[in-house]
Amino acid sequence: MEHLETCYNSLSKQTYKDFEIILVDNNSKDDSVKFTEKNYPDIKILKVNYNSGFAKAVNGGIKISIGEFTLLLNNDTECKEDFLEEMLKGFSDKDTGSVACKMINFYDRSIIDDAGDFIKLKGSPYARGHGDQDIGQYDRHKYIFGACAGAAMYKREIFYELGFFDEDFFAYYEDVDMSFRMQIAGYKCYYNPKAVCYHKRGATTKTMTGFETMLCEKNLIAVRLKNYPFLTLLKCSPYFMIVRIKRYYNFLTKHSSSLFMSAVKGYFKGLLEIPKSLRKRKFIQKSRTVSSEYLENILK
């Protein structure tokens, strides 16, 4: 509840006032719903009677929203008073499909949490600037690969054009997948460093777990198969394998055998889902308006 109260209160102080709040309660075990109903009666609540995963939960919220733009916001965040106002400024270009903010560590506000999401051409997704001291190095407005769905704004119509978050992902990398699909279709992601929120990273999911590791490994295979240009996929496949072997060796030697086994399990789950990923690829590639060179250039 402490996370929700902080988040709600920061939204109530926004300089931009024309918005609705939707709480998607993904079968929480605390009194989040009762707390919200009692203290914030204007908030719309979507109750899910089982843990459907992040992707399905936010899809449900998007579908019942009514605004032109949709902000996805984790409950463990606090937004500066002009956050919504600054996020909306990012849509001045008609080709902008999403806006990324500058996320700061809630507990140490001199530390960057996320300054936009990227994916390495031959490696894995990463949060730009995560853990860095905030000395102004991420204060430049620019177009980037994608936004972290923990605090990202999207044109709502895009979900109806390109599809919603992939519910087969359950959680992790579904935002990377969506960013990729938007880039393929010619929609840009605008990073506005003046839109600032504070994030208690891991406050509701804890740290590295076997389940998280399994999902990340499984979903990364799907992200690549669905979105990479075909020749890029072929060219980079050997490097993908080398990077995974190094990663799994690190799990085995520096973490635990259970984490290693979770990673391997996720990898093989991803392989088993190849036919499904390739079917999705056909749909995604039909919307492609950019070149392979463009896509390779935005992968850092």
Where are the language model's segments positioned?
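Glycine-rich, basic loop-to-helix element that forms the pyrophosphate-binding segment
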Residues: C7, V48-S65, N75, E86
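Short, acidic, metal-binding catalytic loop of nucleotide-sugar glycosyltransferases
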Residues: N9-D18
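A conserved acidic beta->alpha catalytic loop
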Residues: S10, D25-K34, Y50
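Short aromatic/hydrophobic "clamp" motif used to bind/position activated sugar donors
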Residues: T70
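Conserved donor NDP-sugar-binding/catalytic core segment of glycosyltransferases
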Residues: T77-K120
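A recurrent flexible, glycine/aromatic-enriched loop bordering the glycosyltransferase active site
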Residues: I111-D114, L121-Y126, D132-E157, V176, ...
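A short, conserved alpha-helix in the catalytic core of glycosyltransferases
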Residues: F145-V196
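Active-site-adjacent helix/loop segment of glycosyltransferases
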Residues: A185, C189-R279, S292
